[in-house]
């Protein structure tokens, strides 16, 4: 369960997100100011690096607590940013007003929400095993 949870989350934040964002809608968008672009690229590199570390810890060292927590920080950070978006003027909609959704649910919420649920189960199992 722990390996699956971390691997699933890493696949989303270290692979899928860069694939979806290294293009003209994000990194190469003419509508984004340069300062926002540097933050975007920084976030992509940081999250992908965290993901590689998590995979190494889970698959190479069979350690679960730190990779689960790190992955929760990444996915949870997105979820928090999404839910407080009105506070800072954020949006998941593109300039043309469209939004990537699946069955009416934003794909970020669907993916990272699912990953966070798996990660919480992984955290619970990891903590339960440490108490034994």
Task: Specify the residue positions occupied by each region the protein language model found.
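Cytosolic juxtamembrane helix and N-cap/initiation of the first transmembrane helix
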Residues: 1-11
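Hydrophobic alpha-helical membrane segments
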Residues: 47, 69-86, 113-114
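Alpha-helical transmembrane segments of multi-pass membrane proteins
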Residues: 12-24
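Core segments of alpha-helical transmembrane spans in multipass integral membrane proteins
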Residues: 15-18, 35-55, 73-76
């Amino acid at each position: 369960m722990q390996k699956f949870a971390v691997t699933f989350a890493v696949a989303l934040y270290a692979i899928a997100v860069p694939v979806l964002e290294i293009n003209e809608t994000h990194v190469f968008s003419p509508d984004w100011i340069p300062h926002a672009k540097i933050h975007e690229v920084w976030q992509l590199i940081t999250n992908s690096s965290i993901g590689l570390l998590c995979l190494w810890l889970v698959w190479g060292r069979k350690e679960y607590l730190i990779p689960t927590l790190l992955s929760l920080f990444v996915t949870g950070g997105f979820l928090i940013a999404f839910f407080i978006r009105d506070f800072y003027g954020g949006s998941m909609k593109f300039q043309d007003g469209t939004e990537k959704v699946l069955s009416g649910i934003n794909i970020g919420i669907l993916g990272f929400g699912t990953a966070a649920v798996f990660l919480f189960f992984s955290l619970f199992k990891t903590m339960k095993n440490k108490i034994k």
